[in-house]
A protein has these predicted regions:
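Membrane-embedded helix bundles of polyisoprenyl
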Residues: 43-50, 96-100, 171-188, 193-234, ...
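Membrane-embedded, hydrophobic transmembrane alpha-helices
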Residues: 1-86
Length: 429
């Protein structure tokens, strides 16, 4: 019973981050097509603000109550000024809560952490939870392998929880995951059965306790889902606010894992293939991206933290011979195919490209997703080809997670394809 109460309070705590600082309904500029999507903008803004806060030389406990209280007060102000933002549809709100409760109970019962979580992410979260600041991470031997932000969120929401148990911080990962899936649905009340099927289908395909065992892939996966949906919205409605949110999502990805820079660049290149993308917006996108990367580089240099201690060395790359390249490529294809068969989203995407071959480069969204997919494949191959590590061990221990993370780029593309072809109505409903 205590766990259920704590999980319920955590859910409502997380909701505050959807309800402030913006009252999205106040301006047409900030309006999505359904109420439950509006909060995602606030969530993205809040998470970016937390990145800045996490870098400050203050103890977590010294500012967390003030920050959360400010969000609560702003939420109340928004409610009094324009209550619509709080009028979550009862059906989707109940659905959201039930799913969150079920998955959170699974997390609370199983508890075991993934290998990387034990050695990297949890230890980093303890630094913040025990009121050390970002600067102290330089004292942690394995800190430079990956950025800190996912661990910071773990500590931040653990401190906000009722029981302050370790798993309480990870419940935010569940919340972000479910928020990203529900973000795909424009109008939940319309075609309720279809929308229920979509969510359950995605849960069936993607849910596994392992992704909530402290590993950070679920954060990037969720943010990639949101990003591709925002790209689609921008292509259709040309609202600058969508482009702004895309840039903020890219920034979040940059601070979560070392490979975040690869997804950052993949999205950046894909966006530059938008037709009629005027010089002003293109320049703003490139300049913003440059500033974000430069800012992270500056922060790491200032705190004397290595940007990336992953096993990639120019000397090793230059010494690669043809036999080694063929051996690595063969195994990359074998393991890539095997894990793609286990991840149906990644497997289906090329099939959709084949079905849509007539409009692949005529339709803007299809073209950009195709370019992103090709860049994604190039990244996966390069990541293993140029890595100075035993290839079989590396593939067996990490390929499944890279495939899972990357599949976040194609979740909305898959759902959008099924809707447009009326496959749900034709074969399921």
């Amino acid at each position: 019973m205590n766990e259920i109460l704590s999980i319920t309070l955590s859910f409502f705590t997380f909701l505050i981050f959807l309800c402030a600082p913006l009252n999205i309904y106040k301006s047409e500029t900030f309006r999505f097509r359904s109420v439950h999507q509006n909060g995602i903008a606030n969530l993205i803004i809040n998470l970016n603000f937390l990145i800045i806060i996490s870098l400050l030389p203050f103890k977590l406990i010294s500012y967390l109550p003030f920050y959360f209280t400010a969000l609560v007060l702003i939420s109340i102000f928004n409610f009094l000024k324009k209550g619509e933002i709080f009028k979550f549809e009862k059906l989707i709100f109940s659905f959201f809560f039930v799913l969150f409760l079920i998955i959170s109970l699974d997390v609370a019962v199983k508890l075991n952490l993934g290998w990387d979580a034990k050695w990297f992410w949890y230890i980093k979260s303890l630094f913040f939870f025990q009121n050390f600041n970002f600067g102290y991470l330089s004292q942690y031997e394995f800190n430079s392998f990956h950025p800190h932000f996912g661990s910071y969120l773990w500590a931040f929401f653990r401190e906000l929880s009722l029981n302050k148990f370790e798993y309480s911080g990870r419940l935010f990962y569940v919340f972000l995951y479910l928020s990203s899936l529900l973000f795909l649905i424009d109008k939940f009340k319309e075609n309720k059965i279809q929308n229920f099927i979509i969510i359950f289908l995605l849960l069936l395909i993607t849910y596994n306790y392992k992704i909530f065992s402290g590993l950070q892939e679920i954060l990037i996966f969720s943010l990639l889902i949101i990003t591709t949906k925002l790209i689609y919205e921008y292509l259709n409605y040309k609202k600058n606010f969508y482009l702004f949110l895309i840039i903020l999502c890219m920034n979040l990805i940059l601070w979560i894992k070392a490979e975040g820079i690869a997804y950052f660049m993949i999205i950046l290149v894909g966006l530059n293939f938008i037709k009629n993308f005027n010089f002003e917006k293109r320049s703003l996108l490139l300049f913003s991206s440059f500033i974000l990367i430069l800012f992270k580089t500056f922060i790491y240099n200032y705190f004397q933290i290595s940007l990336n201690d992953q096993p990639y060395f120019v000397e090793y790359i230059l010494k690669l011979d043809l036999q080694t390249i063929i051996f690595k490529l063969k195994n990359i294809i074998i393991y890539g195919t095997f894990y793609s068969l286990k991840n149906i989203i990644f497997l289906i995407v090329p099939i959709i490209f084949f079905i849509n071959y007539k409009i692949l480069f005529k339709d803007q969204f299809n073209k950009i997703i195709f370019i992103i997919f090709m860049l994604n494949i190039g990244f996966i191959v390069s990541a293993y080809m140029f890595r100075e590590m035993e290839i079989i061990y590396s593939l067996r221990t990490t390929m499944d997670r890279i495939i899972f993370t990357s599949s976040g780029l194609y979740v909305f593309y898959l759902i959008n394809f099924l809707k447009k072809k009326n496959y749900f109505r034709r074969y399921i409903l």
